[in-house]
C-alpha cells in the first residue's frame, strides 16, 4: 500500500522563516524515521541556494502520523543540509542538537510556542468592522464566554490534531484578543 510522507522544512527567508513542504510517495508504511530517505529540493526558490548551484537536501529527523490524511500517511520534519550532507547555514536545529548534547548532564528542556491569530478577511476575527476593540487587552487574557472568546472549537480541534499526531502539546491559552491563541 502506498503511503504519503509530507516532508516539512524551514526555508531561508529572514527575518521570519517560513515552512515548506512537498509530498513523497513511499511503497509502504514506515515505523522509524531511520527508514526514510534523504530527499533533495531546489534551494534557489527557498533562499537556501543560488540559482546556478541550487541543490539542497532534506534529512528526516522526526515523523508522526498525518492527522489530516489519516491512515499510514505521515508528516516528516527535516533538517536542511548542503549537498555534502553538512548542516545548511539556515539549519539552526543542528546547532541546538550540538548544544543539547554538550550539556546533556543538565537535562535541558526546550519548548516551542505557536501563537496565532484567526482572521476574518483582512482583520482579526471578532473585531469590530471598523477600527479596534473598545476594551483593553487585559479582559481577554484567559477569559471565557462568547463576549471575550471566539473560535474556541477551532482551537480545540487544533490541539486535538496535535495530540493525535503525537506532538507533545501541553496546553493552549486564550491570549489578548478574542481570536489570539497559543498552543
Regions found by a protein language model. Give the residues of each.
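Single conserved hydrophobic/aromatic residue that forms the stacking wall/gate
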Residues: 174-183
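Glycine-rich, acidic/polar active-site loops that bind/position phosphate-bearing ligands
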Residues: 1-175
Amino acid at each position: 500500500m502506498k503511503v504519503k510522507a509530507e516532508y516539512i522544512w524551514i526555508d531561508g527567508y529572514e527575518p521570519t522563516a517560513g515552512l515548506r513542504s512537498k509530498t513523497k510517495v513511499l511503497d509502504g508504511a514506515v515505523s522509524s524515521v531511520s527508514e526514510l530517505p534523504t530527499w533533495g529540493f531546489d534551494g534557489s526558490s527557498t533562499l537556501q541556494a543560488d540559482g546556478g548551484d541550487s541543490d539542497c537536501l532534506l534529512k528526516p529527523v522526526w515523523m508522526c502520523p498525518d492527522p489530516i490524511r489519516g491512515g499510514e500517511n505521515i508528516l516528516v520534519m527535516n533538517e536542511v543540509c548542503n549537498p555534502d550532507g553538512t548542516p545548511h547555514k539556515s539549519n539552526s536545529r543542528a546547532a541546538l542538537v550540538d548544544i543539547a548534547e554538550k550539556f546533556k548532564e543538565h537535562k535541558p528542556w526546550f519548548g516551542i510556542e505557536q501563537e496565532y491569530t484567526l482572521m476574518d478577511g483582512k482583520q482579526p476575527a471578532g473585531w469590530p468592522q471598523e477600527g479596534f476593540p473598545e476594551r483593553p487587552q487585559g479582559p481577554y487574557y484567559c477569559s471565557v464566554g462568547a463576549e471575550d472568546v471566539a473560535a474556541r472549537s477551532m482551537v480545540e480541534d487544533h490541539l486535538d490534531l496535535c495530540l493525535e499526531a503525537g506532538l507533545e502539546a501541553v496546553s493552549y491559552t486564550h491570549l489578548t484578543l478574542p481570536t489570539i491563541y497559543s498552543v
